[in-house]
Amino acid sequence: AEGSTVTISTAGTYIVSGNLIDGSIIVATSENDKVQIVLNGVKIACSSGPAIDIQSADKCFITLAEGTQNSLSDGSAYASEEANACIYATCDLTINGSGSLDVSGNYRHGVFSKDDLVVYGGTIRVSAVEDGLNGKDSVKIGAGDISITAGADGVKSSKSTNPEKGFVYVSDGSLSIDAEDDGIQAKTYLCIAGGSIEVDAADDALHSDLEGALNGGSTTVRSGDDAFHCETKLEVNDGLFVAETCS
């Protein structure tokens, strides 16, 4: 299809396949509704906004169907300034499944949630003008093979008004980041508890405005500034951490 908008207005599971040229999927449901979008071999390009625009819901799940390849891209200019990413959500967003997903964020971010962003599966490749993955309230990565190329931060959480939010937590999975600013940036707390992480960053590889912890996993970093920067406290309890180059 060309120039089409697919709007989801009720809770449920929706299986999507095929190509959409200069169109988008919009989720506009009740704030109590949960929506699952199964990407089953999808290619969506939108020149004037997000490829997937989750405007209202309680929670949204984007599931990558097994054995499928999926591609999402946006344009370099948006018709509305409210949205800011190729996949944009005003609610909690989870990406899971075992398929693959390519995200090209040509306007600002690759994936953005105003609430909690969870990645739990899939082979995900993100390129973005600014941040790769941005969950304002939090980012949690528990599984998946994730590659990020970012013009700003690779992974970021920025909530500052709630001390229990603004954190990034990596418990498992494979994460490769090439970032022009920080590799991973958290406002309150950054914890690496597991997984395999490799970061190339022009600024700090790992950065927390407050606290950080290394509790497990294998992390290798190369950075133009600090390897793991925490303003108040850094705890090292377990795991392998290799800083190949840093300032």
Regions inferred by a protein language model and the residue ranges of each:
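A composition-driven surface/loop motif
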Residues: A1-S247
